[in-house]
């Protein structure tokens, strides 16, 4: 190698690799992503948002409606309330349904733990499917029910679908609730819809098309339901009402 070659070898500039760094997401951006991932209300920490009173305070006023009755819990989340319907209020059979596989897995685990502790939950089962867009209902959720519950889920059903889907769901539930049975709703104020859309912008287009407004009284009355009870709940962060609708027994007006 010549002296010139040697000098060139020594003085040749080294290649410098610059690592490209992805800018860190802001807390606001992270929150947006989180809410988009849970646009159906399927928050994995949902029950940690509520007080940890056992049983769920909603159930204390529902005991007379569910005791000894076959009860279907639609939008059951991780199954906490579903299991309490059996353990604390002696529903004869309870089925929880949710579209989120992770939440249903958590519900199965909660049942396993409850059984290991000797709790009476053998009459509780869980199913994973989108009940708003699946008919007839599947698995152990099929058949006729004495009580159907839609707690903390009506807003999400409405926002993710349409007025027509919600009306059709109320109609279908009327068909599967036994005469004299009950539909338990926990509607949320329109202001809660607006907050949900602010947190989850992908719901905005559906939101702008909605014309029905909670608590859907006229829609339910027109569908044959009779309102028989209701109360306001004032738990921090979850101020809303619970309404009990009845499918009139045969011969009732």
Predicted regions and their residues:
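Conserved alpha-helix/loop element of class I SAM-dependent methyltransferases that forms part
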Residues: 48-68, 84
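Conserved class I S-adenosyl-L-methionine
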Residues: 69-77
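Conserved SAM-binding loop of SAM-dependent methyltransferases across substrates and taxa
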Residues: 78-90
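Conserved SAM-binding motif I beta-strand of class I
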Residues: 93-98
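S-adenosyl-L-methionine
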Residues: 109-139
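A conserved beta-strand element that flanks and buttresses the S-adenosyl-L-methionine
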Residues: 149
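A short glycine-rich, Lys/Arg-flanked "PGG" loop and its adjoining helix->strand segment in the class I
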Residues: 167-179
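Conserved beta-strand signature within the Rossmann-like core of class I S-adenosyl-L-methionine
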Residues: 179-187
